[in-house]
């Protein structure tokens, strides 16, 4: 079935036709953008409907996010959010938490509500609102339940003793310059990579990671994006990411394009070649 969408204006970003007033679609595929009169050849002898829902609106191309990191989003989105900003997500809304006391209260609620047999991952902490974080502070609320508090920037995290024991952090292995403060349970920048390598069995667990990618698809579509890019594919584990991304970010149910580039710090040609052969992802 053909559908003719009328609009007050269509911004095409095409120099040969900067503006239009109609879009013709068949089964979700755009056939033509232009004026209603120019679409007569498509409509002649065909069943079609005219959709006026955009008649007084402006249609513009989808947004492009060249710095999204799908794997990072897939890791973060299943976590519990405690953030200073309100998040309106397709599956619910997260209210802002803007004080140290409120952060601790929310963490205590999560500790009480969530499965005690599972580690607790919290994302969204920022010291400007939530005060100084430390292993001791986490343990004063979560005790010896493995708990990870991930900074809003993603560039640092904090773990309590139980979490460090769970992932195999060995205090004697921590050397000066590793950007790790073992007494505070603080892993940042270079030290974050050390932590991630040990957290991967949990944050990249197949079921959790797949669920995170499904949430990513919802978020990208919800935000009106039609193209996303990642210049650091493989920041967690290249093989696991490449396989999961190729399965999740292609197909008829994915309403956006994805451009993946292997993380520059990956060594050798093998990783780049594998990136170039991700089927269906350009």
Report each predicted region and the residues it spans.
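Non-catalytic terminal/interface segments that mediate subunit docking, oligomerization
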Residues: 278-282
């Amino acid at each position: 079935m053909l559908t003719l969408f009328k609009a007050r204006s269509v911004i095409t970003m095409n120099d040969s036709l900067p503006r239009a007033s109609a879009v013709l679609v068949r089964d979700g595929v755009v056939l033509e953008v232009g004026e209603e009169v120019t679409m007569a050849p498509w409509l002649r002898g065909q069943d079609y409907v005219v959709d006026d829902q955009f008649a007084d609106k402006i249609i513009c191309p989808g947004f492009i996010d060249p710095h999204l990191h799908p794997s990072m989003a897939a890791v973060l989105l299943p976590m519990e959010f405690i953030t200073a900003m309100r998040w309106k997500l397709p599956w619910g809304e997260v209210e802002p938490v803007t004080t140290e006391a409120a952060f601790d209260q929310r963490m205590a609620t999560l500790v009480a509500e969530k499965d005690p047999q599972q580690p607790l991952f919290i994302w969204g902490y920022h010291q400007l609102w939530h005060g100084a974080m430390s292993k001791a502070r986490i343990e004063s609320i979560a005790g010896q339940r493995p708990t990870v508090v991930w900074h809003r920037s993603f560039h640092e995290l904090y773990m309590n003793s139980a979490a460090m024991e769970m992932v195999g952090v060995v205090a004697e292995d921590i050397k000066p310059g590793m950007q790790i403060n073992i007494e505070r349970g603080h892993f940042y920048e270079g030290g974050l990579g050390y932590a991630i390598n040990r957290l991967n069995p949990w944050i990249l667990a197949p079921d959790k990671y797949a669920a995170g990618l499904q949430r990513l698809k919802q978020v990208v579509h919800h935000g009106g994006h039609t193209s996303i890019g990642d210049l650091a594919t493989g920041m967690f584990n290249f093989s696991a990411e490449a396989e999961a991304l190729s399965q999740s970010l292609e197909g008829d149910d994915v309403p956006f394009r994805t451009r993946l580039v292997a993380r520059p710090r990956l060594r050798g040609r093998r990783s780049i070649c594998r990136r170039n052969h991700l089927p269906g992802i350009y």
